[in-house]
């Protein structure tokens, strides 16, 4: 087998993250278009500044809901703008994203939620919401308990982003 290598064109700092890269871009070019997203049957521009505002507003809502550094937060959704905002907001809050495929069965969800130790979840649709809501329990997860135990589930299609933004005010 022949192996090929080349010198790296750049280096990534030890503390550089996807979030810090977008923050840096926001400093350099806040009005640059980062996304186009559907809104009211039209495609609208989302600037770097708009995206970062969304991210930090949602991150504050996650923290207001008890999400702490190192916590795991489930996202069960197809790829969409809100998924990206939530992913970055989870990172901004110091938490860890636990993705679950939208096609996952209830038993698969139960294993992922339990195994990851996630305590908060965001679902895209009502079916996903129903599936994840079966794991909502009162109180904190007991030490050493590996069963699925969520404190809260929100649904993107029912205003999860707005709820989190309001919770963070």
Model-derived segments and spans:
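Active-site-adjacent beta-strand anchor residues
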Residues: 12, 76, 122
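A short N-terminal helical cap/helix-turn-helix that marks the beginning
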Residues: 13-34, 53
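Flexible, non-catalytic linker and terminal segments flanking ANL/adenylate-forming cores
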Residues: 1-17
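Structural core segment of the AMP-binding/adenylate-forming
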Residues: 65, 92-168
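Flexible, glycine- and charge-enriched loops at secondary-structure boundaries
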Residues: 11, 15, 44, 48, ...
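Conserved AMP-binding/adenylate-forming core of the ANL superfamily
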Residues: 34-88, 105-114
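Tryptophan-centric aromatic hotspots in well-structured domains and transmembrane helices
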Residues: 18, 22, 43-45, 83-84, ...
């Amino acid at each position: 087998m022949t192996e090929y290598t080349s010198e790296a064109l750049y280096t990534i700092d030890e503390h550089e993250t996807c979030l810090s890269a977008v923050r840096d871009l926001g400093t350099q070019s806040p009005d640059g278009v980062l996304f186009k997203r559907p809104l009211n049957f039209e495609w609208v521009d989302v600037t770097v500044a708009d995206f970062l505002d969304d991210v930090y507003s949602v991150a504050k809502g996650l923290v207001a809901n008890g999400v702490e550094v190192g916590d795991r937060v489930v996202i069960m959704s197809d790829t969409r703008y809100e998924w990206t905002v939530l992913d970055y907001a989870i990172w901004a809050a110091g938490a860890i994203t636990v993705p679950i495929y939208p096609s996952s069965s209830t038993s698969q969800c139960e294993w992922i939620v339990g195994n990851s130790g996630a305590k908060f979840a965001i679902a895209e649709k009502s079916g996903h919401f129903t599936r994840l809501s079966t794991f909502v329990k009162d109180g904190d997860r007991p030490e050493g308990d590996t069963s699925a135990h969520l404190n809260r589930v929100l649904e993107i299609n029912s205003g999860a982003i707005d709820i989190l933004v309001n919770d963070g005010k």
